[in-house]
């Protein structure tokens, strides 16, 4: 996942990759190889960052890959395909530690205090992808509202059901896509158990 959102050696170490006995050079090569094998994702990072910076810098609206960016009343809004918007408070364009442009905004930091935060291409894409995933899960929750849904965790839904209920029917229902996600290939898996556990 670290590679998918623009992470490099530091992100891989934070996820425990150095515990596998790999050197920094080997980790860097893994990142380089992943990026070469995934050019569309890498391009998405740069397209998203460019449009976000353009929206903030020009106090205007931009769009790429079906994602809309706008600067309104001191906020950067990123509109997802569902129409829901992510908001970044008081965005500014500032120089980052690499000498390039980054968006900073007010938010809650790791110390749980309000502070200035910096974002970057991969982090913006991570927020967008997680937002879309949330919207898809919410759509599934609505389409399965006739079921006794006892909880949901990230991309999982917990349903308490009669044994006669078909797991396949639930998975087929969860794999349905909303009109705003036309063309998305979505599949759902599931399992049955007496009490909740990780698959």
Regions found by a protein language model. Name each.
Residues 1-199:
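Conserved catalytic core of nucleotide polymerization and phosphodiester-bond processing enzymes
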């Amino acid at each position: 996942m670290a590679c998918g959102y623009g992470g490099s050696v530091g992100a891989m170490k934070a996820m425990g990759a150095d515990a596998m006995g790999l050197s920094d050079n080997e980790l860097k090569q893994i990142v380089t190889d992943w990026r070469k094998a995934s050019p569309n994702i890498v391009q998405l990072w740069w397209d998203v960052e460019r449009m976000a910076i353009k929206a903030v810098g020009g106090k205007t609206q931009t769009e790429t890959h079906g994602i809309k960016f706008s600067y309104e009343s001191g906020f950067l809004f990123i509109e997802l395909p569902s129409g829901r918007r992510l908001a970044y408070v008081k965005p500014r364009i500032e120089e980052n530690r690499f000498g390039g442009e980054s968006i900073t905004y007010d938010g809650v930091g790791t110390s749980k205090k309000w502070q200035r935060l910096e974002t970057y291409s991969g982090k913006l894409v991570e927020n967008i992808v997680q937002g879309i995933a949330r919207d898809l899960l919410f759509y599934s929750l609505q389409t399965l509202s006739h079921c006794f849904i006892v909880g949901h965790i990230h991309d999982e839904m917990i349903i308490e059901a009669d044994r006669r209920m078909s797991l396949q029917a639930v998975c087929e229902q969860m794999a349905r896509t909303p009109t705003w996600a036309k063309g998305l290939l979505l599949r759902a898996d599931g399992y049955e158990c007496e009490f909740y556990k990780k698959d």
